[in-house]
């Protein structure tokens, strides 16, 4: 079981919260790590206070704030800043969850499709509801690109509509697949090192290469943890821009 690269993604019940309609509601390891991620973010954002000379936590909080704010301005304009709480929350939650998941014997929340689909659907519904509320029927200009010849316009509109409703799929699967693949690769290399080490001195020598690869892969996963949070957030900003400026 220890060498099984899939075992690390297993959701286990920690305790039961009761039953609703005959269905048990349980607090799982996934729930625990979601709460842990939120707690870490709360400590980072609230604990430092406001100091003239910022400490480590305050510096991280301020850098994260400015990074996300600049991201929104560059993709959705100043009007997009009204969605700052949403984008910032998504970015921080995904980044912290990904980083926590790199620690051995922890759980990676974003490696489960149900989590990433939920986050992507939150963005999709926000875009759809706000776009219709703000623009009314003008929101449907999003599906009619300018400059398209009239004889292929129906086909283009059909493709645009399908593409729009498939956005939550690509938005969620990208994060899920990257985190799943990365952690499986780490587990495979780590298990290989353990098996070689069990062979004695000869195995230790042979384990040098996979150990180096594991270290390099871990460093890459640290980069991917931030990169995937950034990609999810920047795509959120792009989708929000479609709702704010559907005719552009």
Curated annotation (Swiss-Prot):
Cell wall biogenesis/degradation recorded as keyword: no
NCBIfam families: ATP_synt_6_or_A (TIGR01131), PRK05815.2-4 (NF004482)
Transmembrane segments: 25-45, 83-103, 113-133, 142-162, 192-212, 215-235
UniProt-listed HAMAP family: ATP_synth_a_bact
Cell inner membrane recorded as keyword: yes
Similarity annotation: Belongs to the ATPase A chain family.
Gene Ontology CC terms: plasma membrane; proton-transporting ATP synthase complex
Stated name of the protein: ATP synthase subunit a
Database matches in CDD domains: ATP-synt_Fo_a_6
Gene3D superfamilies in alphabetical order: ATP synthase, F0 complex, subunit A
Subunit structure: F-type ATPases have 2 components, CF(1) - the catalytic core - and CF(0) - the membrane proton channel. CF(1) has five subunits: alpha(3), beta(3), gamma(1), delta(1), epsilon(1). CF(0) has four main subunits: a, b, b' and c.
Membrane topology, record value: Multi-pass membrane protein
Function: Key component of the proton channel; it plays a direct role in the translocation of protons across the membrane.
Subcellular location: Cell inner membrane
Gene Ontology molecular function: any one: proton-transporting ATP synthase activity, rotational mechanism
PANTHER family (UniProt xref): ATP SYNTHASE SUBUNIT A (PTHR11410:SF0)
Natural source organism: Rhodopseudomonas palustris (strain HaA2)
PROSITE patterns linked: ATPASE_A
Keywords: ATP synthesis, Cell inner membrane, Cell membrane, CF(0), Hydrogen ion transport, Ion transport, Membrane, Transmembrane, Transmembrane helix, Transport
